[in-house]
Amino acid sequence: MDRRSRAQQWRRARHNYNDLCPPIGRRAATALLWLSCSIALLRALATSNARAQQRAAAQQRRSFLNAHHRSGAQVFPESPESESDHEHEEADLELSLPECLEYEEEFDYETESETESEIESETDFETEPETAPTTEPETEPEDDRGPVVPKHSTFGQSLTQRLHALKLRSPDASPSRAPPSTQEPQSPREGEELKPEDKDPRDPEESKEPKEEKQRRRCKPKKPTRRDASPESPSKKGPIPIRRH
């Protein structure tokens, strides 16, 4: 009896289960479960793939930025190309140096010519007699480089002292030291006796005349004298022949 009763109970339970959940509904439920699970799995896979792609892109960007920063850091130390550039710059500087040397040579030549002209002027002043009026050396025009400082400053001072002495001596000068042009009116003619008025050299009228003549001579521009290497002057010797090699 027990077995039969148990069998009947299982049947009733099955019928009750079938009534509550029929087989079609059960199959649909299982299908929906499978679909929902598969959709969830697909979504998880998609998100994982997207995250993996994002990580790969970020790694690529980081690697690119790191490589760029490394290349920029390597530029700062001197490379062989920069050393060659420095060598080229040094070569350019060495090439530019001869121009400065040429400029210095030209400047030396100008100073030599100036010293020669000053020596010539000294010799000319020494050859002239002491009674002749001396003129102050003309100041040379200022170059672009600035005013040229005269080297023979003592010579200029001596000239000014001589001029001052001549000015002081001009009223008291004797007829023997006066220039030859002033001696002619003062020299006595033949057969005439000297008067006491003529003998007085301190006459203001006579002292004014040599002063005026001296001033005229000072105002006249002095012709530049050049020393010839040959003893004979070119006027006596004639035109200088040109030698053609």
Curated annotation (Swiss-Prot):
<dbReference type="GO" id="GO:0120162">
    <property type="term" value="P:positive regulation of cold-induced thermogenesis"/>
</dbReference>
<keyword id="KW-0964">Secreted</keyword>
<keyword id="KW-0165">Cleavage on pair of basic residues</keyword>
<dbReference type="InterPro" id="IPR009434">
    <property type="entry name" value="NESP55"/>
</dbReference>
<dbReference type="GO" id="GO:0005737">
    <property type="term" value="C:cytoplasm"/>
</dbReference>
<keyword id="KW-0732">Signal</keyword>
<protein>
    <recommendedName>
        <fullName>Neuroendocrine secretory protein 55</fullName>
    </recommendedName>
</protein>
<feature type="compositionally biased region" description="Basic residues">
    <location>
        <begin position="216"/>
        <end position="225"/>
    </location>
</feature>
<feature type="compositionally biased region" description="Low complexity">
    <location>
        <begin position="171"/>
        <end position="181"/>
    </location>
</feature>
<keyword id="KW-0325">Glycoprotein</keyword>
<feature type="compositionally biased region" description="Acidic residues">
    <location>
        <begin position="101"/>
        <end position="129"/>
    </location>
</feature>
<dbReference type="GO" id="GO:0048471">
    <property type="term" value="C:perinuclear region of cytoplasm"/>
</dbReference>
<dbReference type="GO" id="GO:0005634">
    <property type="term" value="C:nucleus"/>
</dbReference>
<comment type="similarity">
    <text>Belongs to the NESP55 family.</text>
</comment>
<feature type="compositionally biased region" description="Basic and acidic residues">
    <location>
        <begin position="187"/>
        <end position="215"/>
    </location>
</feature>
<dbReference type="GO" id="GO:0007565">
    <property type="term" value="P:female pregnancy"/>
</dbReference>
<dbReference type="GO" id="GO:0030133">
    <property type="term" value="C:transport vesicle"/>
</dbReference>
<feature type="signal peptide">
    <location>
        <begin position="1"/>
        <end position="46"/>
    </location>
</feature>
<keyword id="KW-1062">Cushing syndrome</keyword>
<keyword id="KW-0654">Proteoglycan</keyword>
<dbReference type="Pfam" id="PF06390">
    <property type="entry name" value="NESP55"/>
</dbReference>
<keyword id="KW-0968">Cytoplasmic vesicle</keyword>
<feature type="region of interest" description="Disordered">
    <location>
        <begin position="70"/>
        <end position="245"/>
    </location>
</feature>
<dbReference type="GO" id="GO:0005576">
    <property type="term" value="C:extracellular region"/>
</dbReference>
<dbReference type="GO" id="GO:0071107">
    <property type="term" value="P:response to parathyroid hormone"/>
</dbReference>
<dbReference type="GO" id="GO:0009306">
    <property type="term" value="P:protein secretion"/>
</dbReference>
<dbReference type="GO" id="GO:0040015">
    <property type="term" value="P:negative regulation of multicellular organism growth"/>
</dbReference>
